[in-house]
Amino acid sequence: MGLSSNSAVRVEWIAAVTFAAGTAALGYLAYKKFYAKENRTKAMVNLQIQKDNPKVVHAFDMEDLGDKAVYCRCWRSKKFPFCDGAHIKHNEETGDNVGPLIIKKKET
């Protein structure tokens, strides 16, 4: 009688652990499918600039820059690739600390 009751308890525990593991796996898969995709776009830096290109690249000759050039690094500028100060609003909204890239001639 003692042996069969231990077997019944083991079967119940195995069933409970299997159910819990299955529930956890389904929860994880649901999280990955729905929640992670929603947050992926929020983590993107470039939300609107040349989205049809696989990689956004701008190149300038140093001689063409003049004395100073200020480039956007927050991807929010309406004058991209040049900075228009949009990082100020971006920093206030997100708590970020991004600023422009400033390239200027060395003062002699």
Curated annotation (Swiss-Prot):
Residues 32-108 are cytoplasmic. It is a single-pass type III membrane protein. It catalyses: L-cysteine + 2-oxoglutarate = 2-oxo-3-sulfanylpropanoate + L-glutamate. PANTHER family: CDGSH IRON-SULFUR DOMAIN-CONTAINING PROTEIN 1 (PTHR13680:SF5). Belongs to the CISD protein family. It is an enzyme of class 2 (transferase). InterPro entries: CISD1/2, FeS-contain_CDGSH-typ, FeS-contain_mitoNEET_N, MitoNEET_CISD. It comes from Mus musculus (Mouse). Its EC number is 2.6.1.3. Its main location: mitochondrion. The lineage of its organism: Eukaryota, Metazoa, Chordata, Craniata, Vertebrata. It is found in: Mitochondrion outer membrane. Binds 1 [2Fe-2S] cluster per subunit. The [2Fe-2S] cluster is redox-active and pH labile and is significantly less stable at pH 4.5 as compared with pH 7.0. This is CDGSH iron-sulfur domain-containing protein 1. GO terms for molecular function: 2 iron, 2 sulfur cluster binding; iron ion binding; L-cysteine transaminase activity; protein homodimerization activity; pyridoxal phosphate binding. L-cysteine transaminase that catalyzes the reversible transfer of the amino group from L-cysteine to the alpha-keto acid 2-oxoglutarate to respectively form 2-oxo-3-sulfanylpropanoate and L-glutamate. The catalytic cycle occurs in the presence of pyridoxal 5'-phosphate (PLP) cofactor that facilitates transamination by initially forming an internal aldimine with the epsilon-amino group of active site Lys-55 residue on the enzyme (PLP-enzyme aldimine), subsequently displaced by formation of an external aldimine with the substrate amino group (PLP-L-cysteine aldimine). Homodimer. GO terms for biological process: protein maturation; regulation of autophagy; regulation of cellular respiration. GO terms for cellular component: mitochondrial outer membrane; mitochondrion. The chain crosses the membrane at residues 14-31. The modification N6-acetyllysine is found at K55, K68, K104. The gene is Cisd1. There is a cross-link at K42, K55, K68, K78, K79, K89, K104, K105, K106 (Glycyl lysine isopeptide (Lys-Gly) (interchain with G-Cter in ubiquitin)). Keywords: 2Fe-2S, Acetylation, Iron, Iron-sulfur, Isopeptide bond, Membrane, Metal-binding, Mitochondrion, Mitochondrion outer membrane, Schiff base, Signal-anchor, Transferase, Transmembrane, Transmembrane helix, Ubl conjugation. It holds the Pfam family zf-CDGSH. Ubiquitinated by PRKN during mitophagy, leading to its degradation and enhancement of mitophagy. Deubiquitinated by USP30.
